[in-house]
């Protein structure tokens, strides 16, 4: 199928909310070997974020049921729950591996500017983070190191090449701070990164273009929400919700 046709079908699949189809079309477009435009890389991100989002939610529900049945000593239900959770886990790992393969084989190498490179390195960190959520033992440690490395490389580039209010830079800092808090067990680092990012963006808010204003201020609000939650948790209070990250 022609590249233009794949992109068009991905847009149709998005409108129909058929995200697995959308992901398959965008995978085909990436494998054609041309650099993606800004619109196209967003299509890729939305497609896989929706596919993996459903799997992450299902895995969390099943893990919770499995834990409860283990605590109750339910020999009847336990093996079935574990088997189904493992099935979902395998599917989730497959999607993450596909995305990471596209990033390493095509997207990061073909990125022609700093913004694209940061976008794809952030994506790499995100998909290693999703793998870390379901990993155990030595595997988990290796995956966490890979996520941290991708996020850090993206942070280094974004600080040199992008203003503090750039929505991609803000989204990266938001997700890296969630990684510190949820995956790496480093609440102080999470709070420090979120606070510094928010403060620097606030100081630079007057430079924002009308196009970026909505995206940037939305991510800044998510940073502030997470900061409120995390500082309350650190003070020994119960957090009311999971840390937030952008939807695309």
Swiss-Prot record:
GO terms for biological process: cAMP/PKA signal transduction; establishment of skin barrier; intrinsic apoptotic signaling pathway in response to DNA damage; keratinization; keratinocyte development; keratinocyte proliferation; negative regulation of innate immune response; negative regulation of keratinocyte proliferation. The modification Phosphoserine is found at residues 5, 74, 248. It comes from the Eukaryota. It is found in: Cytoplasm; Nucleus; Secreted. The keyword Nucleotide-binding does not apply. SMART domains: 14_3_3. Ubiquitinated. Ubiquitination by RFFL induces proteasomal degradation and indirectly regulates p53/TP53 activation. InterPro entries: 14-3-3 (IPR000308), 14-3-3_CS (IPR023409), 14-3-3_dom_sf (IPR036815), 14-3-3_domain (IPR023410), 14-3-3_sigma (IPR037435). Pfam families: 14-3-3. The record marks 56, 129 as: Interaction with phosphoserine on interacting protein. Signal peptide: none annotated. Present mainly in tissues enriched in stratified squamous keratinizing epithelium. One of its GO terms (cellular component) is extracellular space. GO terms for molecular function: cadherin binding; identical protein binding; phosphoserine residue binding; protein kinase binding; protein kinase C inhibitor activity; protein sequestering activity. Keywords: Cytoplasm, Nucleus, Phosphoprotein, Secreted, Ubl conjugation. Homodimer. Interacts with KRT17 and SAMSN1. Found in a complex with XPO7, EIF4A1, ARHGAP1, VPS26A, VPS29 and VPS35. Interacts with GAB2. Interacts with SRPK2. Interacts with COPS6. Interacts with COP1; this interaction leads to proteasomal degradation. Interacts with the 'Thr-369' phosphorylated form of DAPK2. Interacts with PI4KB. Interacts with SLITRK1. Interacts with LRRK2; this interaction is dependent on LRRK2 phosphorylation. Adapter protein implicated in the regulation of a large spectrum of both general and specialized signaling pathways. Binds to a large number of partners, usually by recognition of a phosphoserine or phosphothreonine motif. Binding generally results in the modulation of the activity of the binding partner. Promotes cytosolic retention of GBP1 GTPase by binding to phosphorylated GBP1, thereby inhibiting the innate immune response. Also acts as a TP53/p53-regulated inhibitor of G2/M progression. Belongs to the 14-3-3 family. This is 14-3-3 protein sigma.
